[in-house]
Each structure stands twice: as C-alpha cells, then as structure tokens.
C-alpha cells in the first residue's frame, strides 16, 4: 500500500552545473527538500517513531516530546499526525516563523525557550518534561534510530546513485545523525570515501549546524567516522545558499548553503574528486529571516 511514509527517501541526486572548480572534480547534491515534510529530517523522524513502535515503547495516542531547531520538529509533527500521536516540541524562539507555523499546522504543541537558552535549554527542558512523565522523549541527539535511518536509506541511495564513484561525502553537523549513518554505510563499502563534517566558526551562528559544547555533544556522534571537520562562517553559508538559487536553480536553506560551500572547498583541494553534499531542506522556510532579502542581492552577496 502506498502511504505517505512510503514517499520518504529515494530523493534525487543532481550534479551542479555552474558552481565548483574547473579541475575535473564533480559536485553532486542530494535534494532532501523533496521529502514530504520538506527536509532530510523526515528520514530520522520516521525511523525514531517506527522503531520505538516495534520495541513496544510507544503506541498511537501517546504524547511524544522532542527538542528541535525546526526541521526535525516539522518531520515529527507530520509523522505524529499520520500515526495518531500527540507531539510536544521545544524550540528556541529565534527560529523562523515558517518553521513554527509548519509544526502547528500539523497539530503539534510548540513550547518556546529563549534565544539565550538556545538548543541546550530546549534539550534540558525536554528531558525534564519526560522525567515528570509528560510524554516519551524521542531524543534525536542520543537516539541510535536517528543515524540508523541514514545507514539504511541515505547512504545506500548515495552509493547506488553515484555507481560507487563517490570519493568525498560532505555534511553539516547538527544532531550528527546524517553524517554518522551515511559514514558508517560508506565505510563498509569496498573503496575508501573521505567524510567531511561542517560546523560554524567560533562565534558564528548557522541555523541547523551546531558547534556543540563538550557536555552537549550528541551521544550518537562517533568522531572516528569523520575524517575532517571544516569551520564555516555564517556569511559564507548564506552567500552560497543565494548563489545556489541564482546559478543552479536550487532554492534551499542556510545549512545547505554551508554544505555546498564545504563541498566546493573539498572539490578545489581534490582535482578529479566526486563530492556529494546534502541539500537539507528548502529555502521557503527562511524567507521571513531576510536572508533572501533585496539588500543581500543589491550588495552582490552570493551572486
């Protein structure tokens, strides 16, 4: 039977035509905005709920709790609506209005913490709520069902779509579920693939990408699965995001711009490489933030 959850995954992989170095390298991007709730997080959201159901930990009608910066919350709200769960989502109040509206549209209850509390504060409050018995904490940051989704779907799709020719995989790091799961799969293949993670520079803020304090580093992260970590400035991520729209026709979010900025760096340093990056979501979730505003384009940013 073809249900909404069956439409998650098997997203297109397309080659950039006008961006990237002229050194024989190729940059391919996986368009995760094509998932039904609009982001790569659809995969992890489905996995966390389905696997918990299989273990008998949750059943329709239960309350689920999660801390999110946006995309995971939207994806979980969609799956919760589909399967009959009540969803409580905790998020910093500086996240975009589009993301808040999407979560509420799916029927989720949204609980905001301050910008100063940030994702760390949202995670702490989600844990407190679960400990008080207010619902089941899915805990994407420490839940192995998160990277398992990418080990069983995203990684195999990339390998198949590149005919095994991929040489480098580049991914932004938030929960680290995508990079952990994809890397684990690629490590098991017959050829070496270099895994590159991306994080914000010290003092820089990029939605969807985190530079975690040691005490908040996601428990699912395995540093041995990442060969290199690149630091990105917010300006570089935003400029690349705008350039993707103007030059490649790919309308995406800031973290995706960061991923492609990192992929371009990797391609420049490795002539002949086949580099794959993740386009995490769509740009329409960021319109209210002003990153696509006329001022940015009038200043030549990203064009």
What annotation goes with each model-predicted range?
Residues 1-303:
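PLP-dependent amino-acid enzyme catalytic core
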């Amino acid at each position: 039977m073809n249900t909404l959850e069956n439409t998650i995954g098997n997203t297109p992989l397309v080659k950039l035509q006008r961006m990237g170095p002229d050194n024989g390298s190729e940059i391919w991007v996986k368009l995760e905005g094509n998932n039904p709730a609009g982001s790569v997080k659809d995969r992890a959201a489905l996995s966390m709920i389905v696997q918990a159901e299989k273990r008998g930990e949750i059943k329709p009608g239960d309350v689920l709790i999660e801390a999110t910066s946006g995309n995971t919350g939207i994806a979980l709200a969609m799956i919760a609506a589909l399967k009959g769960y009540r969803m409580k989502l905790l998020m910093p109040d500086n996240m975009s209005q589009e993301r808040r509206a999407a979560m509420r549209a799916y029927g989720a209850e949204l609980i905001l913490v301050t910008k100063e509390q940030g994702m760390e504060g949202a995670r702490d409050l989600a844990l407190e709520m679960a400990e008080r018995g207010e619902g089941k904490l899915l805990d994407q940051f420490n839940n192995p069902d998160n990277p398992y989704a990418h080990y069983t779907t995203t990684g195999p799709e990339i390998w198949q779509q590149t005919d095994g020719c991929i040489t480098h995989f580049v991914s932004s790091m938030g929960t680290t579920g995508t990079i952990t799961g994809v890397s684990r799969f690629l490590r098991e293949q017959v050829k070496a693939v270099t895994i590159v993670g991306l994080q914000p520079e010290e003092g820089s803020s990029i939605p969807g990408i985190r530079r975690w304090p040691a005490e908040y580093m996601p428990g699912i992260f395995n540093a041995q699965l990442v060969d290199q970590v690149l630091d990105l400035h917010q300006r570089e991520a935003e400029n690349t995001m705008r350039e993707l729209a103007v030059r490649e026709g790919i309308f995406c979010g800031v973290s995706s711009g960061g991923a492609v900025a990192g992929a371009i760096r990797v391609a420049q340093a490795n002539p002949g490489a086949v580099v794959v990056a993740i386009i995490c979501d769509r740009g329409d979730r960021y319109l209210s933030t002003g990153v696509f505003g006329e001022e940015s384009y009038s200043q030549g940013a990203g064009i």
